[in-house]
């Protein structure tokens, strides 16, 4: 029942919805760009779910959003999901992380659930006629004791390394599966 901070790589606009299904028994809100709140119907839905708008162009407003996310977790209201890359990756490669987002976990003393996703980038191309295989891996749950006293940049580097290692393992597995299918 403990609230946590969920961090994941970001490939598609469908990532938060897929995560909400995966964590359906956990009250979970994401930090999202302001434009998403202007999308008809979807904007009202994410607002009602407690999503937080982050203004990446205004440091003071962004800090207010991070503080609100910290309060969500600390008060037990919601767990918070965030994409430390700050935007979707068009190539599937991890983009540079925004270290400041880890202030949420550090200040709320919350576990960090490290997750990777793959396949969500294909949903738009396949919908509605072909199903899309999506993989979600809970890579690691980092307890607050493991990052106590660390700066946000160090926490960011640790999380990124876990994600990179998991994505590399998935790539190797997928290459082996493809090779096995060709040989069969």
Task: State what each model feature region is.
Residues 1-3, 130-131:
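A short, glycine/Asx- and small/polar-enriched loop/turn
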Residues 2-59:
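Catalytic core of membrane glycerolipid acyltransferases/transacylases, capturing the structured
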Residues 63-184:
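Non-catalytic C-terminal accessory region of glycerolipid acyltransferases
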């Amino acid at each position: 029942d403990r609230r946590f901070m969920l961090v994941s790589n970001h490939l598609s606009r469908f990532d938060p919805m897929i995560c909400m299904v995966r964590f359906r028994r956990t009250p979970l809100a994401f930090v999202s760009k302001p434009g998403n709140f202007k999308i008809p119907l979807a904007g009202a839905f994410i607002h009602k779910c407690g999503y937080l708008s982050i203004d990446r162009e205004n440091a003071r407003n962004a800090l207010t959003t991070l503080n609100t996310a910290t309060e969500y977790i600390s008060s037990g209201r919601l767990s918070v999901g965030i994409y430390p890359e700050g935007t979707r990756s068009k190539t599937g490669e991890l983009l540079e992380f925004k270290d400041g987002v880890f202030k949420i976990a550090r200040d709320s003393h919350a576990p960090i659930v490290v997750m990777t996703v793959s396949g969500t980038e294909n949903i738009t191309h396949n919908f509605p006629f072909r199903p899309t295989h999506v993989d979600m891996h809970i890579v690691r749950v980092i307890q607050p004791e493991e990052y106590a006293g660390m700066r946000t940049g160090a926490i960011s580097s640790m999380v990124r390394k876990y994600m990179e290692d998991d994505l590399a393992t998935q790539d190797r597995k997928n290459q082996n599966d493809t090779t096995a299918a060709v040989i069969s």
